[in-house]
Amino acid sequence: MTNKEKALELIGTFVSGDSVKAKKLLAKDYIQHNLAYGTGADAFIGAVEYLASSPVKTTVNNIRAFEDGDKVFLHTVYNFAGTGEQVAFDIFRFDADGKIAEHWDNLAAKAEVNPSGHTQIDGTLEKKNVDREETRKVVSEFVGDVLRGENLDKFASYFDGDNYIQHNTAIADGVSGVGAALEAMAKQGIQMIYNKTHFVLADGDYALAVSEGSFAGAATTFYDLFRVENGKIAEHWDVMETLADKATWQNQNGKF
């Protein structure tokens, strides 16, 4: 079984309630960075058993799955025990024994279509067999130059004219859509700041950048998935999550 298959099996236990399978897949000292859950394999297994006992069943719909070295990253829609659909990016790290040893994620409520009629999950599904390192390089440089604001003069150079498919819930397609959204935010005094990027994971023509910063003054984590075409940024999906108050954390591992 590939690591990607193992990760999909693990999230499937939220539906099946198969705690035995979850235990087999997880390293005992599993490190959890979702701050709403305890750390360790036992805490994960407890969540599986709790969801299995709920009168409203959990649903899991994986949309995209990728692998990069010892990490798998997934784009999935969850509905935990009928609490409402959430769009998530999950990252799982595998240890030398092939066990799932660490997990990071970002979740956001599923929203209505954006100004261009796209959802948070639709769009291109096919993955092209191109050099992941080229993809990683383009996305890493874009995140630094543009999202972290280190060289904003290069903004337009990352796109093929105004061709850019946008899945952010509030922004329209095109470079022009980004410009209009930033202008509207500025008028409202809203700043979106990327301070540090922790991961840029790549598989084929897709790369997921994981960053921290702030949105409208609140500490925020940003998961941005990009599809690269002919060396240009062609499509974007994202999940932003406000960092929970530390007093509510169920583990002390931090978001990263």
Q: For each predicted feature, which ranges?
A:
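C-terminal and inter-domain tail/linker signature
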Residues: 1-256
